[in-house]
Design a protein with these regions (language model features):
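N-terminal amphipathic/hydrophobic targeting modules at extreme N-termini
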Residues: 3-5, 13-14
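Phosphate-group recognition and catalysis centered on beta-loop-alpha active-site segments
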Residues: 6-8, 17, 23-31, 35-220
Length: 220
């Protein structure tokens, strides 16, 4: 969550040193008052109260990006070996409808190819390699499909599937739910998103599915 305070001075004349100092003090005071208000009456107390009696759960972010290439089968296998109860993965849709496990909307950072996910078809995946950017030991690691991740995780670890919204999707929610049903994993997965519409749609399609709304509290 971000706060931005804009202070305007309509006067065109130059301020004295004392005037500049007072202006700075006033700005600081306003920011501090807002900060105190946030701590006292804002979201933070509600968040802390909600989590007071809730046990901590370890989630392998991007399937375990600290120990293996992010969002890969290698990372998921390591998360399982390490005993993580939940692995979070990011899912996007290719132009042909294939669901892949990928965080960025472009392959540049992880695979070195400056191509957008929505401009790519499934047959291109075999040409993309995402392991060597993490470590030479993982050279050859490829981008998995959601189906491959489900097959690997079934009965072994809960998947928190974050659905990425780019505006290029076609029946994303239906496609994901169909796969979960095919693998009988509706109860083994949690659907997450920063887009409330996606979560609402998933609940309409499958009222019993677990969902989580992802949001930023603080970003630098």
């Amino acid at each position: 969550m971000e706060f931005m305070v804009n202070c305007y001075n309509k006067s065109d004349h130059k301020l004295s040193w004392e005037g500049k100092m007072m202006k700075t003090i006033r700005k600081t005071a306003i920011v501090m008052l807002l900060f105190v208000y946030f701590l006292t009456y804002g979201v933070l107390p509600q968040v802390l109260a909600a989590g007071k009696d809730t046990p901590m759960i370890v989630v392998a972010h991007r399937a375990g990006a600290k120990v293996a290439p992010e969002n890969t089968l290698a990372a998921l296998e390591q998360a399982i070996r390490d005993g993580a109860p939940i692995a979070e993965i990011d899912v996007q849709q290719l132009s042909d409808g294939t669901l892949i496990v990928m965080h960025d909307s472009n392959f540049k950072r992880t695979a070195g190819e400056d191509v957008c996910v929505w401009d790519t078809e499934a047959d291109v995946l075999s040409t993309l390699e995402v392991g060597s950017t993490f470590s030479a030991a993982y050279r050859g690691e490829q981008i998995p499909t959601l189906e491959e991740m489900l097959a690997c995780a079934r009965g072994r670890i809960t998947l928190m599937i974050e659905l990425k919204y780019t505006g290029q999707e076609d029946a994303l929610e239906e496609s994901v739910l169909t796969l979960l049903q095919d693998y009988d994993m509706v109860d083994e997965c949690i659907i997450g998103s920063m887009n409330k519409g996606i979560l609402q749609k998933m609940k309409e399609l499958e009222p019993g599915i677990s969902t989580v709304f992802a949001f930023l509290i603080l970003r630098r």
